[in-house]
Amino acid sequence: MAVFTAVSDSDLAQWMRHYELGDVLAFRGIPSGIENSNFFLTTTRGEYVLTIFEKLTAQQLPFYLDLMRHLAAHGVPVPDPIPRDDGALFGELHGKPAAIVTKLDGAAELAPGVEHCIEVGQMLARLHLAGRDYPRNQPNLRSLPWWQENVPAIVPFITDAQRALLEGELAHQAGFFASDDYAALPAGPCHCDLFRDNVLFAHAAPGTGHDVRLGGFFDFYFAGCDKWLFDVAVTVNDWCVDLATGVLDVARADALLRAYQTVRPFTAEERRHWSDMLRAGAYRFWVSRLYDFYLPRAAEMLKPHDPGHFERILRERIAHTPALPEIQTACN
């Protein structure tokens, strides 16, 4: 969520004429992230986020915005796109598609504990089930075909050892994706980027027995139809790791995965390929971070992520992956 496209006061005034959101009180760019131009927008009607989509096209965008509306209608806390005066959920700003969505309450928890992971696991499973009847179908655009297309451009910048890992894991994942077991994995709309900074928490209401309350999931602009287990793996690889080493925190991982299973139990195929999918989740972000680090775009406020973080996670997942935890039922 860096700012690649600047928006002046006059640009904003012209844009806001298409919305019934009152008068603008504050407007500022959001410096984190690397994909779209994002701005916090405060008006006399409330708080919002304006996003200018730097890569997504007008043809692709309805999948994401309609998905957010669909999930919200099914009780999943996500930003709600605001219709324009013509009823459309997005328009054009500086020749690029742009939209306004509601701003969720709460703050990111960058040092999550077990209780945070329980909340995330349960809500991720609810998101997956809520998306089962979503009518649009668009693949995860950062999956195997994207890796195969972009790895050759990265290779000249990295060491021989990194190249061996990058190309070897690509071959491993290509084989996994071609397998019958992979085809049998449950699938549907996925967030595909559910990192700690894409989830908000607020204080729980008194008397609920909980210290935290999940405020919502946001930044759905990497979402796509994929295997649900991939979404779980991406989430675990961020929420349940030691950030210095990439080693899984067993207590947090166990809490998140057990909580997920209380809503949607894992299948036998998912249990069999948990290690492969954790590796796929790590590989996806190692490739994209290498690409953004060595082949960056110009931006006003760009903070590229360290590619080494997901290299460490990938190496660790290849070496050590615990099995998915079982959940106890009345029949056990």
UniProtKB/Swiss-Prot annotation:
Superkingdom to which the source organism belongs: Bacteria
InterPro entries named among the record's database cross-references: Aminoglycoside_PTrfase (IPR002575), Homoserine_kinase_II (IPR005280), Kinase-like_dom_sf (IPR011009), Pseudomonas-type_ThrB (IPR050249)
One MF term in the entry's GO annotations: ATP binding
Keyword ATP-binding annotated: yes
Pathway: Amino-acid biosynthesis; L-threonine biosynthesis; L-threonine from L-aspartate: step 4/5
Descriptive protein name: Homoserine kinase
Family per similarity comment: Belongs to the pseudomonas-type ThrB family.
GO-annotated biological processes: threonine biosynthetic process
Swiss-Prot/TrEMBL catalytic activity: L-homoserine + ATP = O-phospho-L-homoserine + ADP + H(+)
EC number: 2.7.1.39
Enzyme class (EC, first level): transferase
Organism of origin: Burkholderia cenocepacia (strain HI2424)
Alphabetized UniProt keyword annotations: Amino-acid biosynthesis, ATP-binding, Kinase, Nucleotide-binding, Threonine biosynthesis, Transferase
